[in-house]
Amino acid sequence: MTNSIVNKVTGDIFDTEVLPIIPKDIKKVTKWQFKWAKELPFSEVYKLVVVGNPNILQGLIAIRDEKTHYYMALIENAPFNIGKSKIYEGVPGNLVAFACKKSFDKGYEGFVSFDAKSALIEHYEKTLGAKRAGRGSLMYVDTQAATKLVNRYFK
């Protein structure tokens, strides 16, 4: 179980869990930015949901086991969790912490890599503790940052 997401309006805190996506979930992501059905053959896809309410997807993550670390292919907030009018905060942090936890569980020391949009590189450095791998868009979460994320988001 992950620690929580926070309702931005009321301040209420909700326990969450990360579950594998099931086929009926794909029908619910038609208005999302990414084409999640196309990712299923290549990645493990998981959903973040409020405990006891698995039918409302708060966010999704697609990860791939690269045998030395996990690669985060996609991550996305639900449309209602984007922008200034978003309902819940904490969705992406929960999902990245989940990927880090899986990396620890596989013996990869928490390492997770991903390609970042250049406009978000600084944001990921601040919020996730991610680092750039060279000058390009490839970033990674190392053991130290992964430990902080897992400790923050997992009970």
Where are these regions (language model features)?
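Short beta-strand-alpha-helix junction that forms the catalytic/metal-binding core
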Residues: 91
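Non-catalytic substrate-recognition and accessory regions of acyl/acetyltransferase enzymes
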Residues: 1-86, 94, 101-111, 115, ...
